[in-house]
Every structure is written in structure tokens, then in C-alpha cells.
Amino acid sequence: MGKIIGIDLGTTNSCVAVMEGGKPRVIENAEGARTTPSVIAYQEDGEILVGAPAKRQAVTNPKNTLFAVKRLIGRRFDEKEVQKDIGLMPYTITKADNGDAWVEVRGQKLAPPQISAEVLRKMKKTAEDYLGEEVTEAVITVPAYFNDSQRQATKDAGRIAGLEVKRIINEPTAAALAFGLDKQEGDRKIAVYDLGGGTFDISIIEISEIDGEHQFEVLSTNGDTFLGGEDFDNRLIDFLADEFKKENGIDLRNDLLAKQRLKEAAEKAKIELSSSTQTEVNLPYITADASGPKHLVVKITRAKFESLVEDLIERSIKPCEVALKDAGVKVSDIQDVILVGGQTRMPKVQEKVKEFFGKEPRKDVNPDEAVAVGAAIQGGVLQGDVKDVLLLDVTPLSLGIETLGGVMTKLIQKNTTIPTKASQVFSTAEDNQSAVTIHVLQGEREMASGNKSLGQFNLTDIPPAPRGMPQIEVTFDIDANGILHVSAKDKATGKENKITIKANSGLSDEEIKRMEEEAAKYADEDKKLRELVDARNSADSAIHSVKKSLAEHGDKLDAAEKGAIEKAVQELEDVIKGDDKAAIESKTNALIEASQKLGEKVYAAGETESSAAEPGEPQEKTVDAEVVDAEFEEVKDDKK
């Protein structure tokens, strides 16, 4: 049985970890980094870049470089948060046929789960390269405050990437696992403050020792799925653009290339201001007008940056108050405060958290890696490798159905431990009503219209009866992933209808299957492209070696032999420009064969000459190197 890997699919960066010898280990990617930018670029030739290579070319390809796609996952196009992002993102956010927010790249409409799947595939490959075996199962984390549609969409992304998602777990819970696994300090209540690239979560978690078992029980969770480091970056971008406009009368936000350079600079400046009190943003040739090129040079102090984002930091405090109230604990009951997410490195954020909780946050948890580590631990629990750990998570939002008068009747209250099941009996509103529509909602508002609609289905063929007589039992069942299954049953006839909530939008199974096939096709094309590049490298190497040997020892061959080798070189040089791998390999072999005569001649000459002078030895090596070099290249290709 293969390993279950843990993946933190982040808005800005992603991370993968695995349990090894009872300890979680974060895995470095192909670029040698422990985190991978969640950036995907679609090239003109159809190639898809993921991670650092995609981020590097963002300035020159802003419209086709996608970042922060997690902010769109499982969301409707008309939601106000999505509308706000449309104005900020250099890429095109568009409305799908089902009303979801999708992205348009190079004339093709893509669903957010399809784009996120590219990042997951990179994480999968990173783990496979390290483990030396295929990986098919994963635990993927999501913000605790993600609703049902967003969780379902994340699961879909895993499927498209070729992963069976064994469990979806909440990011703060994962961080608590990473923090508390090796702590033998009895019962303690902790607060996990998770401010990432695009989302904010706060969870109050109790870690207890029960019969030698570590129990992690989430008491409450709250958050804001549209608050994160990206918003802090945007404040800096606006500030820089405004300063430049004041001075030069040009708004850089209207120029995609300039805006992308601003984004890069803002991110760097923000990071620098965590360790120094002032930084300078220096962007030469940012734009030009009739008077010539323009340069942007702006000094930013830490105090200035803090004043720009003060309200964003303040926005994170309200959910903390609600979470404490929901958990029924006082600030003084919290023993440890754990910071997760890169944005918590900002001194002002740490200061605000310290001020609210009245204690210094812990510094022994890596904010970038804790979530992936926790996911890997949960993978180990599911696999049976990690014993004595029990995780009790909660559903972040209340769930219910719409009843008479457009009211939301809650069946499951927020912060209920999952998995859980709840039933309630409802009846008809009209005489002789033969069908009822079950409209499933998620949220905290009293009226149905103020909450998120998760979907609806009908229960038909109810026997005619006066209003209020039929007994319709509605059952809500939330699984361990926090995904909802709903059934409605007519108690008189036993007739039942049930659905797993697929958001009234979301991806259908057919769409997911198509995207899986597309992903597999791309993987196949990538493999073919790599094999073609390897074949070209072998051919180049053979041409170089033979030409070198001809220049040094060509006079030992007669004209016909020399002509045959030159012809083989020419033929290989002609096919190397094309895309036919078989032709390149065949002509490479033909060249190696043709040049063997040269090798023999040189070898023979070397044998007859005196060993003192040893002119033959290096010559013999040169030709040998030519033959062996080509063979060596081929062996290396196979490994690839």
C-alpha cells in the first residue's frame, strides 16, 4: 500500500509532506524549495508551467499567469467577493454556464478545480520523486471556514490531479496536530490564528490526554475566506500606483505589465518590512510617455505600511471574539497561541494577536509548513502508522432547509463535531400537496435568502392529504470531510430521495472525468516532449564528438569514409530541428555506426605509435568518448 501524502493547497504557496519512520517530513520540490508558489502559467505552445518557473515569467505573460485561484474555488461569479477580484486580477474571470466563477486563458474556459489540480499534480510528482513510488492518495487541507461547495471543489481538484482524497481537513486543525503531536503536557486549550495568502481562520482547539490517547477536539472555528496576504499586497500596489500617478499623471494599474511588476515589488517590500523598518521600491523603466521613460522610486516605512493595512488586521479580530464566545472559553483559558500562514510574520499582526490574547504567540511552529505536516500526520492516522491520535473536527457553518415564509430552519448548528447526523420531521404547506422541494442552505442568517444555497431536490408522489398531515423526515448527514449528504423520506409510504450535496453549480462527474482525461493527456504530452528533448541532447552530443574527432583525425580516413560520416552528420543536423523523436534516434544511431570506422583507424594508429610520445592515447580517448558519450546519454534518457 502506497503512502498517503499531506498537501497544503494554499492561495499563495503550497507544501507537501509525508510520514517517514513515524515522523512527518516536508518534501523539497524539483527546484529545491520546501514550498511551491501556487502559480500556473499557460504558454503559447500549450506547455503549462507550475510553481517558481510560472512565477518567474509572470511579468511578461500577465494575462495567462494565474495566481490566488483558491479565492475562486467553489464560488459563484455574482458573489461580491468575486466581483471585487475581477478588478484586481490581471487574468480574465468569467461566468461559467452553471453560474460559477471560471477563468479564461488563451480562449479556453477553465474551472478553478482544474487549475488547482495543476498545483496538486506538481505536489504529487514532488512526493513521487522523493519516495520513488507512485502516490495515489492524499489528505488535502482547506480553510476551516470553507463552505460545502468549496470543500467539494477542492475534492474535485484532487480527483482531476489523479489523487484519491482520503480526507479533507481544516488548516488550523492540521496546524494543531503538527504542534501538539509530541507535546506531553496534559490537557490544554490552544488558539490557532491562521492568516494565509487568501483566507483567514481562527480555531479554538482542546488537546487532551484520554487513556493515553492524544485527542484534538475543535471547540469552535470562525474566519473570513476573503482576507489574506493578497489583500495586504493589493494595498501596497495601490499605494505605489497612487504615488506614481501623483508625480507623473499616469495610472500604472491600466498597464498589465507594469501592474505585474508592481505586484512583484509589493510582495518583496512587504516581506522586507517584516525584518527592517524601511525599504525602497525601485522599478526602472516602469512605463514611458512622450517625454521619455519613467522610473518608479518610492520609499516605504514599516509605519506607513501598517497604516495602509490597519483595517485588514482589525478585521481578523472580530472572528477571534466570536470563536471564543462559541467555544464558551475566556481569553485567559487559552494556554498557547499558534500563528500559521506567511502573513503572520508581519510584526504588527503578531503584536495585535498578542494584545488580543494577552500572551506571546508561540514561535516554535513553522507558519509555512505546519499545515502540510498536520495533513501528513492525518494521513498517517488513516493509514494506521500513527497511533493514539483522535481528531474531532467541526462544521464551520450551520446547515438547514428553507421552510414556510422563506425562513431557514437549522438542522445542524455551527461548530457541531463531525461526522454527525440530524433528522427533523416537516410537513406540507398546502392541501393535497404531492411534492415538496428540499432547499438546502448553509449559513447563520435567519432568512433563507441571506444564506448560501447548497442545492435542492424534490420528493414526489406524496399521497393527497390535508396540509400539515404528511410526515416528511429530512436527514442531514455530514461525513468526516465536512461534506453533506441529505435525504428526505415520506414516513407514510417509505418513499425516499437522497443526494450528496453537489452545489447547485459545481462540476458534474462528466466534467471531472473530462478534466481528468485532459490532465492525463497533458502528462503524456509532457513525457513525450521530455523524451524528444532528451533525444535532441543525445544527437547534439554525438554531432559534437564526431565533428571534433573528424577535425583531429579526419586525415586518417579515405574520402569515401569521410564523406559517409559527413553525410550522416548532415542528415542528423537536418532531423534534429524537427519533432520526430524516432527519426532523431535512428539518425543518431546511424551517425554512431558511421563514425566507428574513424574510431577503429585512430585506435589502430595509436597502437602502432610509440607509447613514449603517447600521441595516440588521448586521440583514442577522444573517439572513445564520442562513442561512449552517445551511449551514456541514452542510458540517462531511459532513467528520465
From Swiss-Prot:
Acidic residues bias (residue ranges): 626-640
InterPro entries: ATPase_NBD, Chaperone_DnaK, Heat_shock_70_CS, HSP70_C_sf, HSP70_peptide-bd_sf, Hsp_70_fam
Keywords, in A-Z order: ATP-binding, Chaperone, Nucleotide-binding, Phosphoprotein, Stress response
Phosphothreonine PTM positions: 199
Family the entry assigns: Belongs to the heat shock protein 70 family.
Pfam families noted in UniProt: HSP70
Name of the protein described by the UniProt record: Chaperone protein DnaK
Transmembrane domains' residue ranges: none
HAMAP family: DnaK
Gene3D superfamilies: 1.20.1270.10, 3.30.420.40, Actin, Chain A, domain 4, Substrate Binding Domain Of DNAk, Chain A, domain 1
Induction profile: By stress conditions e.g. heat shock.
Annotated spans, Disordered: 603-640
Gene behind the chain: dnaK
NCBIfam families: PRK00290.1 (NF001413), PRK05183.1 (NF003520), prok_dnaK (TIGR02350)
